[in-house]
């Protein structure tokens, strides 16, 4: 099943995921809220991790980089000499090359098969990727990211919470989503991250409160929706623990400890 899963994800992104129509990818059309009212909020959410990325460094790893499709994503490597992009999709790598040019290092390979040096990267990022890896291999991915990133340097992972208030409400009313899942998706509960506490310092932060699907339902595409997004962003910053534990997306910053 695990090999089939890799083929499934690879097939989607090599066949259609990064096809661009009207400057928008299939991936963005499927998984992002592209409406005008949400634009500023989503931009601020994407920029959140810049607070945790080192101000300078030589090498930053982008695991499952895609084509670096948003301007905010491009900003993550602005203070580094090289951005190392790993992705299953040849199209994604080719598009990333056009943006990074000689500043990029490119790997059209399976992440688990690439032999990176230990303690090589000054920072590693993985956005919306780990939960598309088989649930029994996600730990392996985090361990590898920690191994190849320097001691006390950040490994930043954007992940999803399976126990949101919306999901709890759905379970109460016995709601079942009949929409076919495009690619594999499995999220461990937040406490899953505690297993890494013996090898890394771990901190959690809110990323975005709602999936794009729910945003489109809850927030109207007008000035009222835009105002509501401002309130949500303020509350995420003010009451971070509540939003991490009860809403959709959060990110984890892991810093490998120096073990004696």
Locations of regions flagged by a protein language model:
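Conserved class I S-adenosyl-L-methionine
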Residues: 1-53, 57-66, 156-178
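A short, conserved alpha-helix within the catalytic core of class I
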Residues: 133-144
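A C-terminal cap/extension of S-adenosyl-L-methionine-dependent methyltransferases
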Residues: 174, 206-260
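A conserved beta-strand element that flanks and buttresses the S-adenosyl-L-methionine
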Residues: 125
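Short alpha-helix
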Residues: 183-200
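Class I SAM-dependent methyltransferase SAM/SAH-binding core
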Residues: 66-113
């Amino acid at each position: 099943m695990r090999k089939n899963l890799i083929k499934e994800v690879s097939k989607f992104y090599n066949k259609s995921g990064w096809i661009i129509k009207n400057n928008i990818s299939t991936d963005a059309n499927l998984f992002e809220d592209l409406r005008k009212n949400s634009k500023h909020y989503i931009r601020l959410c994407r920029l959140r991790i810049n607070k945790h990325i080192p101000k300078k460094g030589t090498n930053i790893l982008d695991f499952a980089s895609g084509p670096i499709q948003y301007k905010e994503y491009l900003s993550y490597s602005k203070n580094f000499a090289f951005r190392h992009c790993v992705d299953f999709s040849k199209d994604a790598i080719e598009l990333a090359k056009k943006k990074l040019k000689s500043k990029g290092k490119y790997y059209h390979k399976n992440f688990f098969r690439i032999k990176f040096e230990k303690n090589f990267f000054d920072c590693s990022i993985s956005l919306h990727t780990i939960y598309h890896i088989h649930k029994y291999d996600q730990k392996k991915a985090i361990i590898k990211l920690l191994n190849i990133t320097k001691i006390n340097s950040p490994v930043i992972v954007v992940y999803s919470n399976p126990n949101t208030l919306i999901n709890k409400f759905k379970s109460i009313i016995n709601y079942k989503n009949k929409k076919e899942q495009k690619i594999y998706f499995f999220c461990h509960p937040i406490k899953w991250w505690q297993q890494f506490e013996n090898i890394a310092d771990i901190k959690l932060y809110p990323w975005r409160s709602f999936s794009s699907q729910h945003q489109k339902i809850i927030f109207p595409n007008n000035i009222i929706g835009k105002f509501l997004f401002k309130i949500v962003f303020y509350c995420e910053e003010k009451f971070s623990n509540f939003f991490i534990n009860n809403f959709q997306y959060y990110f984890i910053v892991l810093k490998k400890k120096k073990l004696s």
